[in-house]
Amino acid sequence: FLGGLMKAFPALICAVTKKC
């Protein structure tokens, strides 16, 4: 679970901040 969370976190930040 933790590994998946770390993998999804950057994508979440990208979606929220629109900075990819």
From Swiss-Prot:
GO terms for biological process: defense response to bacterium; defense response to fungus; killing of cells of another organism. Its main location: secreted. Disulfide bonds join 14-20. GO terms for cellular component: extracellular region. It holds the Pfam family Antimicrobial_1. InterPro entries: Antimicrobial_frog_1. This is Ranalexin-1Ca.
